[in-house]
Every structure is written in structure tokens, then in C-alpha cells.
Amino acid sequence: MAEKEKWGIANIYSSFNNTIITITDITGAETITQWSGGKVVRADRQESSPFAAMEAATRAADDAKEKGIVGLHIKVRAPGGNGPRTPGPGAQAAIRALARAGMRIGKIEDVTPIPHDGTGRPGGKRGRRV
């Protein structure tokens, strides 16, 4: 019988300041590799750029391939909560780079935390007065 293919989960956290890519096994319990935009570029202002996300995703995919992972289910997360609910500029670039690196892509889902009327937004009763 043929050996079963190993799949993993790619957690992509993309804010407007950075992009963090963590690849875990299928249970999500064991981290295989973790890369961020800040690890691959030198300037702080470029951490969130699509180029940094692409570079981080490529390196993460290489690490995962070494461990024998052939496919990934992708979970995209934005800051959420009181922060923005849209992923940063690196999310799409990271997904594309993972696919281009030769990883098979399974499900892509959005796991941004959404408050069910939790705490109030920063700014107070009268908002931010400029």
C-alpha cells in the first residue's frame, strides 16, 4: 500500500505591521516552522510588504518540504478584535508564494477573531478628537 501523504496547516497572521507564517502538523499541536516578514528584511517599514511575505512563505515551504509535508490547509488571520478585520498586504502574497513553491493547497479559511460585543473601541465616548 502506498504511503499516506503528509499534510499540514499554514497559519498566516497578516497585519499592517508584519506577516507571520507558522506551519504546523495537521493537528495544529506541533509547530514545524515559523517565519515572519521581520526575519527576512532589514528595514522595519518593509516587514508587512508583499515581498517580505513572499520570501517568508517560500522559506517556510522549503522547511516544510524537508519534513515531508506535501500539502497545506491555510488559515488566514487579521488582527481582529478591536483592530482591523482585513488582512494586511502580505496575506495574498504569502498564499501565492506557498502555491508557487510546490505545496498543494487544500482549504483556505479566514479565522480572524470577531468580537460578539466585547470591549469598546479605543477612543472613548466622543471619539478621537483631532
Curated annotation (Swiss-Prot):
Keyword Ribosomal protein listed? The answer is: yes
Q: Where is this region: Disordered?
A: 108-130
What UniProt keywords apply to this chain's record, in alphabetical order?
Ribonucleoprotein, Ribosomal protein, RNA-binding, rRNA-binding
Q: Mind telling me which InterPro entries this protein's record contains?
A: Ribosomal_uS11, Ribosomal_uS11_archaeal, Ribosomal_uS11_CS, Ribosomal_uS11_sf
Select a single GO molecular function from the record's annotations and give it. rRNA binding
Which family, according to UniProt? Belongs to the universal ribosomal protein uS11 family.
Question: What is this protein's gene name?
Answer: rps11
Against PANTHER family, the record matches this protein to: 40S RIBOSOMAL PROTEIN S14/30S RIBOSOMAL PROTEIN S11
Q: Name one GO cellular component term.
A: ribosome
Assembly information from the UniProt record = Part of the 30S ribosomal subunit.
At the top level of its lineage, which domain of life is listed?
Archaea
Gene3D superfamilies in alphabetical order: Ribosomal protein S11
A GO biological-process term: translation
- Spell out the SUPFAM superfamilies in the cross-references: Translational machinery components
Briefly, what is this protein's role?
Located on the platform of the 30S subunit.
Keyword Metal-binding tagged: no
Q: Indicate what this protein is called per its UniProt record.
A: Small ribosomal subunit protein uS11
